[in-house]
From Swiss-Prot:
It comes from the Bacteria. Its EC number is 5.3.2.5. It comes from Geobacillus sp. (strain WCH70). Keywords: Amino-acid biosynthesis, Isomerase, Magnesium, Metal-binding, Methionine biosynthesis. This is 2,3-diketo-5-methylthiopentyl-1-phosphate enolase. It catalyses: 5-methylsulfanyl-2,3-dioxopentyl phosphate = 2-hydroxy-5-methylsulfanyl-3-oxopent-1-enyl phosphate. Homodimer. NCBIfam families: PRK09549.1, salvage_mtnW.
Length: 413
């Protein structure tokens, strides 16, 4: 029988076995031992089952936080798939709906049967197809971000885009807070961006993709996305957690929306940071986003300005790129506070199949965005060649200026 197994971290004063059994029954058939035998037989296939309870050592920091001594443990519960439809809202409401309001419980992971996975699309393009679009195969990709666009017009956008592309970046994305507005409306951003990037391509022979921010009311998104495709948009940036995972899946599954989708983590910080509550980042930003169809996933790096715990960040990347899953791999995009001096760390931890994403690290370069792009490309080349950044900087002025400004982290093998 197909099932979904949920893994939780639970803190509780009670016996953890009883707590787990209460969850398994409460989120499925409601009660068991007081049911007549005939009803038990009828409901058995719907009953949640405790798979395991692993009691952990007490955590003094947790006890101080809660102001009392609590037992803690890892609990795994199997939910029969026939209890809920094969969609994310039904899944999350079952395994962590009212349970998320009931005590000290954190959802760590979900394990799906192969049958259940087949109900979901995964990325339309994934890492390999995006590399084909760019004709870049043997290095991490480089992405930059529009900055300071609120209150600016299309002329400013076009020039900023041009400078970023001339610096050698592979992708440029809108700021996630750039919404529909009179100065840079959605459709005109696409057409202006396309003109600029075609001009740069004719000059340099290098392709750059532009991720335009898809925003607006939920039930208008599909038509807006289809219009973007008609206008020649390259990629859709999407603030998925402001809308819901199911909305991203709906965009992915529409056969008229034939361009990659880039998932931004905005608002996910309301769900993931606590070690006692919420959802583990590797599940929310990794496994689930890949399941519903994100081609790229942004998340905080372990060493930038909005740092995520290293284990959590690596866990997200692992879920996005695990080649044992039946889906195409999603591009991990560790972000926030990235400058050229951090490239050796990014390369060591996330490897070739990742994207180096920078905003201020591009635009804040002494030679502007084009210089920032050149500095990053030199840093990436150095990491690939096993050269130190300081050694590479002796041969590249843009990288030298970046290191003088931000410093550099050298990684020893």
């Amino acid at each position: 029988m197909s099932q979904v197994i949920a893994t939780y971290l639970i803190h509780d004063e009670k016996d953890l076995e009883k707590k787990a059994e209460g969850i398994a029954l409460g989120l499925t058939v409601g009660s068991w031992t007081d049911l007549p035998l005939l009803e038990q037989e009828q409901l058995r296939k719907h009953k949640g089952v405790v798979v395991s309870v692993q009691e952990l050592e007490e955590n003094e920091r947790a006890n101080r936080y809660f102001g009392k001594r609590l037992k803690r443990g890892i609990v795994r519960i199997a939910y029969p798939s026939l209890n809920f439809s094969a969609d994310i809202p039904a899944l999350l409401t079952t395994v962590f709906g009212k349970l998320s309001l009931d005590g000290e419980v954190r959802l760590l992971d979900l394990t799906f049967s192969d049958e259940w996975k087949r109900k979901f699309p995964g990325p339309r393009f994934g890492i390999d197809e995006i590399r084909k679009k760019l004709d870049v195969y043997e290095r991490p990709l480089l992405m930059s971000i529009f900055k300071g666009m609120i209150g600016r017009d299309l002329t400013y956008l076009s020039e900023q885009l041009k400078q970023q592309a001339l610096g050698g970046v592979d992708l440029v994305k809108d700021d996630e807070i750039l919404f529909e507005n009179e100065l840079t409306p959605f459709e005109k951003r696409i057409t202006a961006g396309k003109a600029v990037l075609n001009e740069v391509y004719e000059k340099t022979g290098k392709r750059t993709l532009y991720a335009v921010n898809l925003t607006g009311k939920t039930f208008e998104l599909k038509e807006k996305a289809k219009r973007a495709v008609e206008l020649g948009a390259d990629v859709l940036l999407f603030n998925v957690f402001a809308y819901g995972l199911d909305v991203l899946q709906g965009l992915r599954e529409d056969d008229e929306i034939t361009i990659p989708i880039m998932a931004h983590p905005a608002f996910s910080g309301a769900l993931t940071p606590s070690e006692f509550y919420g959802i583990k980042a590797s599940l929310l930003l990794g496994k689930l986003l890949r399941l519903v169809g994100a081609d790229f996933v942004l998340f905080p790096s372990p060493y930038g300005s909005v740092a995520l715990d290293k284990e959590e960040a690596l866990g997200i990347a692992a879920e996005l790129t695990n080649d044992k899953e039946p889906f195409k791999r999603s591009f991990p995009v560790p972000s926030a506070g990235i400058h050229p001096g951090l490239v050796p760390l990014l390369f060591r931890d996330f490897g070739i199949d990742s994207i180096v994403n920078a905003g201020g690290g591009i635009h804040g370069h002494p030679d502007g965005a084009a210089g920032g792009g050149r500095a990053f490309r030199a840093a990436i080349d150095a990491a690939l060649a096993g050269k130190s950044l300081h050694e590479a900087a002796r041969e590249n002025e843009a990288l030298r200026k970046a290191i003088d400004l931000w410093g550099a982290v050298e990684v020893t093998s």
